């Protein structure tokens, strides 16, 4: 069962845990992956989960449904993505980690894309689509960028769009019935 946003949800920063949190109810708090040093100043005051957040929640839940993730993991992904969209500090592109692809794509917010490094391939969710570069959330466990640098799952990176390729769509498997 998927949780549904409501008027009582509140974003707040927890200094003790150094994390942006989302109060879902009196008994449930979601801890994002993001620390204070990664956040814009407005994240340090309590903010409501607004109508735009709710719209993005439903948009992204529809997009990530094609991932082979459990619903709780999809919700975790989407809430982290909304936190990035709303509270993450602006980033400069770090495209050099990834190889160029041809033809270049122009992704949209919520698109699932792939990017390759010399050490492997990763899947990403586009959080903010730009004309030249987009902010992406890593969906791969500890993607190796270089011999000394990894990008953790839910890590955020801005990349030029010519590094992205569409995520292959899984083909339905049918068995022949006689």
Swiss-Prot record:
Its main location: cytoplasm. Keywords: Cell cycle, Cell division, Cytoplasm, Septation. The keyword Magnesium does not apply. The keyword Ribonucleoprotein does not apply. GO terms for cellular component: cytoplasm. It is found in: Cytoplasm. GO terms for biological process: division septum assembly; FtsZ-dependent cytokinesis. Belongs to the ZapC family. Contributes to the efficiency of the cell division process by stabilizing the polymeric form of the cell division protein FtsZ. Acts by promoting interactions between FtsZ protofilaments and suppressing the GTPase activity of FtsZ. Interacts directly with FtsZ. This is Cell division protein ZapC. It comes from Aeromonas hydrophila subsp. hydrophila (strain ATCC 7966 / DSM 30187 / BCRC 13018 / CCUG 14551 / JCM 1027 / KCTC 2358 / NCIMB 9240 / NCTC 8049).
């Amino acid at each position: 069962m998927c949780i549904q946003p409501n008027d009582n949800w509140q974003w707040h920063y927890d200094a003790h845990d150094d994390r942006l949190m989302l109060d879902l109810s009196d008994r449930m708090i979601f801890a994002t992956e993001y620390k204070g040093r990664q956040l814009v100043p407005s994240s340090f005051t309590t903010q409501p989960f607004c109508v735009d957040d709710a719209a993005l929640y439903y948009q992204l839940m529809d997009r990530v449904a094609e991932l082979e993730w459990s619903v709780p993991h999809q919700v975790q992904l989407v809430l982290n993505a909304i936190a990035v969209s709303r509270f993450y500090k602006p980033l400069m592109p770090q495209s050099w980690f990834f190889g160029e692809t041809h033809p270049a794509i122009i992704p949209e917010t919520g698109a699932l894309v792939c990017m390759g490094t010399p050490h492997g391939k990763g899947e990403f969710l586009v959080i903010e689509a730009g004309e030249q570069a987009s902010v992406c959330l890593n969906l791969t466990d500890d993607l190796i960028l270089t011999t000394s640098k990894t990008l953790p799952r839910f890590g955020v990176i801005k990349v030029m769009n010519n590094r992205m390729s569409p995520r292959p769509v899984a083909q339905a498997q049918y068995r022949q019935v006689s």
